Regions:
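Hydrophobic aliphatic residue packing
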Residues: 10, 23, 27, 39, ...
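Generic structural signal for secondary-structure transition and capping sites
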Residues: 32, 48, 52-56, 79, ...
């Protein structure tokens, strides 16, 4: 059908799944379960929205500074969802609080540093 956007399969790495669990646990412990559930639902909506037009995401500045433009990011403030488009798949690698030292997080998780 003309005008129908391409659909991508969205996959979460084990690390991204663990990120979601850690975010939920942290908010549950220091705030409340209802807010943790709200944030988790919102993050999952952001993740699922990448099934259409994932190219809309920006390049993480920490990686662009290293000349790396194969990863993109989208946001549910203050959280950053870092992903890569491979064929018809969107692979989520990192879901992290953007207030953290993202240079270290990205180096460790994406570059194996």
């Amino acid at each position: 059908m003309a005008g129908t956007p391409a659909r991508f399969d969205v996959l979460l790495t084990k690390g991204a799944e663990q990120d979601l669990e850690a975010i939920h646990d942290h908010i549950s412990e220091f705030d409340c379960v209802a807010n943790a559930n709200h944030v988790l639902d919102a993050l999952m909506a952001v993740v699922e929205s990448l099934s259409t037009f994932p190219e809309r995401g920006s390049y993480p500045k920490e990686l662009v500074g290293l000349g790396i433009k194969e990863y993109r990011q989208t946001f549910f403030k203050p959280y950053r969802v870092i992903y890569r488009i491979t064929g018809n798949q969107v692979i989520i690698y990192v879901i992290a609080d953007g207030r953290r030292d993202m240079q270290s997080v990205l180096a460790r998780r994406l570059l194996g540093a």
